[in-house]
Amino acid sequence: GKYAEYYTPRAIAQVMARLLVGDEANLRGVTCYDPSAGTGTLLMALAHQIGEDRCTIFSQDISEKSSEMLRLNLILNNLSGSLPNVVQGNTLTEPYHKEENGSLRKFDFVVSNPPFNLDFSDFRDTLASDTVRFWAGVPSVPAKKKDSMSIYLCFIQHLINSLKTNGKGAIVIPTGFITAKSGVERKVLTKIVDNRWVYGCISMPSNVFANTGTNVSVLFFDKAASAEKVILIDASKLGEEYKEGKNKKRRLLKDDIDLIVNTFKNKEAVEDFSVAVSYDEIKEKGYSLSAGQYFDIKIDYVDITEEEFNNRMANYKAELSRQFAESHRLEEEIMKQLDALHFNVNVGNNE
């Protein structure tokens, strides 16, 4: 419906929550934050995975309407204690949740499905001047198409800044980012690999979001940089197609979610689906987080005995000889028919 812009598909929210928290986690007193919370789909999935009585929710979103819906969501999900932490405002220019000394508050879990592209030319320079917070820089203002400014790059940096030293986070981003070759995109990508913050990337099927045709991926961060290998998954072929009005959409089914979660947790290599690679391997591949670039190219060789080889060659030769003979016969037949043709002066004469 019309609130699609505030909504993350539940399946993606489940994948993010299960992978960040685990399926048998026994956590207490943890903090969860979303800097672009919308109506709270990601936060609700996270709270449900942890246990609503074991966590506190913090959020900020520029939309008053979605913040109101998030408050309602908290009440319906036994999270009323977190109501004072739902804030309407611009997270990038005026982050609300701070420590007493004025620095950004740090959380155990941070999740985000931020806007990808937005005209933020009016406060771009303000952000760019804060080089500590935006360590990889801020996209410049283009001469045309200001609404194509990649604001999500600011949210990636803000998310990482908002994690405790052992905190974990996940963010939905356009898939183009994971093979970025230049600009702020490239600086963010190299930093999250060099610092070993990113430990997983899942590329989702096309058309999983109601409001965008953009292909999306989910990045997973561990501020403790404890992973030895990064798990990369190409889930683009999963899910089932359905129609929403005139639009074709795709949704992940329960089996798809389980496959993604189990493959990710076990860091399994599955042909044409997933691969676990070291940070050095990622650097060798030009910092690509695209699973497909690491898949082996397979050439199938068939083992045969010398006798089988000789039999096959004899059959090929016999077949070729037969075809040559047939060709020669046809050639002679055509030549005979051509020889039999004579010029007839009376053809076409009515007399």
Where are the regions a protein language model picked out?
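Conserved S-adenosyl-L-methionine
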Residues: 2-112, 117-121, 125-128, 173-176, ...
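A conserved structural/catalytic subdomain of Rossmann-like adenosyl-cofactor enzymes
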Residues: 104-351
